[in-house]
Structures are given as C-alpha cells and as structure tokens.
A protein has these predicted regions:
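Residue-identity detector for glycine
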Residues: 18, 29-32, 70
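Flexible loop/hinge segments at secondary-structure junctions
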Residues: 75-391
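Low-complexity, intrinsically disordered or signal/transmembrane-proximal segments
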Residues: 14-15, 27, 48-49, 59
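Bacterial N-terminal signal peptides
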Residues: 60-70
Length: 391
C-alpha cells in the first residue's frame, strides 16, 4: 500500500513529552510517498498535525519514526523498514540508517528507542518489521509470537561512578557490585571496596545507587552477570529485564543514566559502554573470570566473545556474561534483532533481508566506531546462513 505524507515544520514542542526542549522542535518534516505494510491500512499522514504524547500504538509509533530528525530523505516508492526497541543499540542503528541510506534510497530504515520489552511486545503484535534488545526471548515469545533473535553486534554494560577526588582507576568485582546494588554495601570506603583498591584513599561518602526501570535490556545484561557471580543476588533479584531493585533511583534512558551519574556526587550506575564514553563519565575496571581487572573497550568486548566456546556462538541466544579469558570484559553480551519468522509481504521481507545482509557485511565496520564490537567472522557466517532462510 502507499502512504502520502507532506512537508511542514513544528515551531515548538506540542507533544506533551515533558521536556523543556524537544528534539522535534523546528525540525523539517520530509515528504514523499512510501510503501508500508498492508496492515497499516490506507491513510494520509500530514505532519501539520502534532503528536499528543509518546504513544506506542502502531500508528503513533509509525508517525514518530517517520519524523525522526536527521533521517535521510526518502525516494519515491521507498520501502521503509520500521523498528523499535532498546536504547543500547540505538546509536549503531542510527549509523546504519545513515550509511545504508546513502547506498540504497529505495529501502530505508527508521528506529525508535522504546525499551527492550516494549520492542518485543510491538513486534509480537505486528507493529513494525523488527525490534531490538538485549533480553533472550522466552519460549512463549518464540512459539506463540513466531519470533527469532539474531545477534547484530557485541555490547558491554559498564559500571560508572562519580568520585571527584578519586583519580586512579577504581576496581570492582562482581560480588561487590552485587552487594552495592542489593544495598548491603552503603559507603565508598566500605571494607569490601577498600580491599580491591588498596592504593586509593576512598571517601566516606554514602553510595548513591542509580538503576534502570523495568523493561530495559541493560538490566537484563547486568543482572545476568551479577546472578552468575553472586548467589545472593541470583536468589533475591535474578536475571530479568525488570528487576525489583531493593535500593536506588531510576534513570529512564541510557543517556539519562550517564547524565545522572555525572551530576550526582558519590553515585554509581551502569550503562552501555558507548554512552559512558560519549557521556564522559568514569568507568570502573571489573574483575573477570581470568582473575584480572579489565575495563571495557572494543578489544576486551571482542575478547569475551572470542573466549566463549563455539557452541555458545551457534546458539544465537547464548549468554556471554562472565566469559573466560584474561582479556575478557565480563559484562559482555550480544544485542539482538528480533524478527518474525512468518510474513505474507514478500517485498518487505526481501527488503529486510537485503538490509540484514548489509549489516552482516559492510555494516559491521561501524561497530567499533560507535563503541561496540563487530561479531567474529565465524559467527557472522552462521548468522548469514540463518538470514538466507528468511526469504
């Protein structure tokens, strides 16, 4: 089906999004004719209408994605692939949108960060073409929702902190991190932390814990690691995208987490590596399974995947947390793209497969540039085989 949309601008934010300034303010609304899934039905979209709030209904999700600032102009009759999910991989999807769009004006992609759990819900209910996140699909989601997950790049969740008077590298183990986020370790000069940092004079500041609300992929990766290294954490919280944190205040988005920690003296939180780098916030070195304290980098993220056994690669939903190896960063994970295995729209399926083939070839070169790590070549070969079966 065809959808026509027009060009206009919004002079000020009327979205009731609660922000003092909104990214939609004074943004041009590009125009054109695009090809969308038949399930969206015929409608004429004009950007002279404003969106009342960040609704996640199918139609409003579509409107938001079509008007994302900075998106490349659409060719006539372009197929627009619509995706939503975790904010963790949002920067790499945005980069892929730009680079792929330069090469192919007939297939475009729009991605909106709404959280891992919400993204899975959207794709399960038929909204969009794919979703993305860091949580493993449940058997119910695979069977009843007809979904599969494929890894796209490697990510790391890093502990970040704000101790202005500490200039040396802070070291933390998984057990100490678990104790902090359980509320058992309450001050920065507690014996458990001091033992790992004998060369640092730690302040007697209370620890201000900052966590994430429910439905977030970074929660899943972080709790997966903490559950592997702490039996108490596993029993009290467990591996989940929606943990019931016993202490702390929540940061809604990954960028909010970096901002909160940077602005709160004595705080600790966790965020995807590239957000920590771009947010200029201090990162702790974490004790890995090889007995070394390692900081996150594209190299240490890659090392964790390389050190994992090959069967864990071939199981595309496998956990990489606490991987072996002296150089491995221990809070490493795949970030996945979630796809429906059944589609009646061959043109859209073909466009999606073309896009996937690109991200598993040319697209991988942008991973390290954006603060992630590319998938190892043997794993890429296996994933491409899976993609070829989607047609």
């Amino acid at each position: 089906m065809m959808v026509t949309w027009s060009v206009s601008t919004v002079a000020s934010c009327q979205h009731s999004c609660g922000r003092s300034r909104c990214s939609f303010e004074n943004q041009p609304r590009l125009g054109g004719t695009i090809r969308l899934p038949a399930r969206f039905s015929a409608l004429k979209i004009t950007r002279q209408q404003t969106i009342p709030r960040w609704s996640l209904s199918v139609y409003r999700l579509l409107l938001l994605i079509l008007s994302l600032p900075g998106a490349p102009a659409l060719a006539q009759n372009a197929i627009v692939l619509v995706g939503s999910g975790s904010s963790v991989p949002a920067p790499i999807y945005n980069r892929w949108t730009q680079e792929y769009g330069k090469q192919n004006r007939n297939i475009q992609m729009r991605y909106l960060a709404v959280g891992t759990s919400e993204g899975i819900k959207q794709i399960s209910h038929g909204a969009g073409d794919f979703s993305a996140g860091e949580a493993q699909l449940t058997d119910k989601e695979r069977k009843e929702g007809g979904l599969i997950e494929l890894p796209v790049v490697l990510i790391a969740i890093v502990p970040i902190y704000n101790l202005p008077d500490v200039h040396q590298e802070l070291r933390l183990s998984g057990e100490v991190l678990a104790a902090i986020f359980l509320g058992d370790v309450k001050t920065w000069n507690a014996p458990q932390i001091a033992k790992l940092n004998s060369e640092i004079t730690l302040p007697s500041l209370p620890i201000q814990v900052i966590n994430r609300p429910g439905g977030k992929g970074s929660n899943y990766v972080f709790t997966d690691f903490l559950s592997k290294v702490s039996s108490k954490f596993r029993a009290q919280v467990g591996v989940t995208a929606s943990p019931k944190w016993p202490v702390g205040e929540a940061a809604e988005r990954s960028s909010d987490m970096a901002d909160k920690v940077r602005g709160t003296r004595g705080s600790i939180g966790f965020v995807e590596y590239q957000y920590a780098v771009k947010g200029s916030v201090a990162q702790a070195a974490v004790l890995n399974a090889g007995g070394r304290f390692v900081k996150a980098s594209s190299e240490s993220i890659d090392a964790a995947c390389q050190a994992a056994e090959a069967p864990r690669w071939n199981n595309f939903s496998a956990s990489l947390a606490d991987a072996p190896g002296a150089d491995s960063f221990p809070i490493t994970s795949f970030t996945w793209i979630y796809l429906r295995t059944r589609s009646s729209e061959s043109a859209r399926t073909g466009a999606l497969v073309d896009f996937l083939n690109w991200i598993y070839t040319d697209g991988q070169q942008y991973a390290a540039q954006e603060g992630y790590a590319a998938l190892p070549a043997p794993l890429l070969a296996e994933v491409r085989k899976k993609v070829s079966n989607l047609r």
